[in-house]
């Protein structure tokens, strides 16, 4: 029984924490499960990630970001996500195409149809069964990052992060049935309880 679950949200919203918790929970249930992330998730993809997040030697335009993110995505899908789904496993991915649309489309201002087209080409049209959106005020979320040095995206101004948040909201509005929207400022235990509830329902439907 294959299932594709993605986590989305702005910087510092707790995606990584919750995706790891869900992975551990499903493994304890004895279910075949793969945890991965974007950008990266593969050796080649991780090299692209370092360029995207930390390069200071050259200017990286929004269009270049779009193409690099999707190059990394294509590698990840071909080598990790599709094989796992074909093997009947549950795949949990920290970020996916919605992030690219929110960041490079709404955040950077690239044409939304162009972003959607490139995303679709790179993903082969693969759409998540469930997308968990952890929504949080961008200023509060960035405070969670602590004293770690910020990458290129974390370093952007508040206006950028607000546009990204608005972008996720716009995506959610067009496909509400695919999403589980959660307030990321809630206690982590409460957030995870709601995630477990939704995933359990989804697993039950798939087993019928």
UniProtKB/Swiss-Prot annotation:
Binding site for ATP: 9-16
GO biological process: dTDP biosynthetic process; dTTP biosynthetic process; dUDP biosynthetic process
GO CC annotation terms, alphabetical: cytosol
Keywords (A to Z) from UniProt: ATP-binding, Kinase, Nucleotide biosynthesis, Nucleotide-binding, Transferase
EC number: 2.7.4.9
Entry-linked SUPFAM superfamilies: P-loop containing nucleoside triphosphate hydrolases (SSF52540)
Pfam families found in the cross-reference section: Thymidylate_kin
NCBIfam families reported in the protein's UniProt record: DTMP_kinase
Function in brief: Phosphorylation of dTMP to form dTDP in both de novo and salvage pathways of dTTP synthesis.
Name of the protein: Thymidylate kinase
Species assigned in the record: Dehalococcoides mccartyi (strain CBDB1)
Organism lineage: Bacteria, Bacillati, Chloroflexota, Dehalococcoidia, Dehalococcoidales
Gene that produces this protein: tmk
């Amino acid at each position: 029984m294959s299932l594709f679950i993605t986590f989305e949200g702005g910087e510092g919203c707790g995606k990584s924490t919750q995706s790891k918790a869900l992975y551990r929970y499903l493994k304890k249930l004895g279910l075949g499960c793969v945890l991965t992330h974007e950008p990266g998730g593969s050796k080649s993809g991780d090299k692209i990630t370092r360029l995207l997040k930390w390069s200071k030697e050259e200017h990286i335009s929004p269009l270049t970001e779009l193409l690099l993110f999707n190059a990394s995505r294509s590698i990840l899908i071909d080598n990790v996500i599709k094989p796992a789904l074909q093997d009947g496993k549950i795949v949990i991915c920290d970020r996916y195409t919605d992030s690219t649309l929110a960041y490079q489309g709404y955040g950077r201002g690239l044409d939304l149809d162009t972003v959607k087209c490139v995303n679709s080409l790179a993903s082969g049209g693969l759409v998540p069964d469930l997308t968990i959106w952890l929504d949080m005020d961008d200023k509060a979320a960035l405070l969670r990052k602590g004293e770690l040095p910020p990458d290129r995206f974390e370093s952007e101004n508040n206006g950028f992060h607000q546009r990204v948040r608005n972008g996720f909201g716009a995506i959610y509005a067009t496909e509400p049935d695919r999403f589980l929207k959660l307030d990321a400022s809630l206690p982590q235990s409460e957030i995870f309880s709601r995630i477990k509830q939704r995933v359990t329902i989804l697993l039950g439907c798939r087993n019928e």
